[in-house]
Amino acid sequence: MATFDDVKAVVVEQLSIDADAVKMESKIIEDLGADSLDVVELIMALEEKFEIEIPDSDAEKLIKIEDVVNYIDNLKK
């Protein structure tokens, strides 16, 4: 769950939302209220935090927080 906690912290900071709103099943746009610019900034912040690169083709598949956590965990293997 360490990855989730780190992702959650980035999401809370980038979207200026309450931490309680961020759950594994939360959809970034529909549930957390992100717009397309928010998503771009969120991806950039995640890349910086985790020292990874997320190609646009992968970024568009990251719909839920769970998708982001699993993606990052798979890169770290």
UniProtKB/Swiss-Prot annotation:
A molecular function (GO) term: acyl carrier activity
Gene Ontology CC terms, in alphabetical order: cytosol; membrane
Pathway: Lipid metabolism; fatty acid biosynthesis
Coiled-coil features, chain-numbered ranges: none
Any Pfam family: PP-binding
Compartments where found: Cytoplasm
UniProt modification remark: 4'-phosphopantetheine is transferred from CoA to a specific serine of apo-ACP by AcpS. This modification is essential for activity because fatty acids are bound in thioester linkage to the sulfhydryl of the prosthetic group.
One of the GO BP terms on file: lipid A biosynthetic process
Residue numbers of O-(pantetheine 4'-phosphoryl)serine PTMs: 36
UniProt keyword Hydrolase, yes or no: no
UniProt main location, coarse: cytoplasm
Keyword Lipid metabolism in record: yes
Span of domain Carrier: 1-76
Protein keywords: Cytoplasm, Fatty acid biosynthesis, Fatty acid metabolism, Lipid biosynthesis, Lipid metabolism, Phosphopantetheine, Phosphoprotein
UniProt function note: Carrier of the growing fatty acid chain in fatty acid biosynthesis.
Family: Belongs to the acyl carrier protein (ACP) family.
PANTHER family for this protein: ACYL CARRIER PROTEIN, CARRIER DOMAIN-CONTAINING PROTEIN
Protein name as annotated: Acyl carrier protein
Species in which this protein is naturally found: Campylobacter jejuni (strain RM1221)
Gene that encodes it: acpP
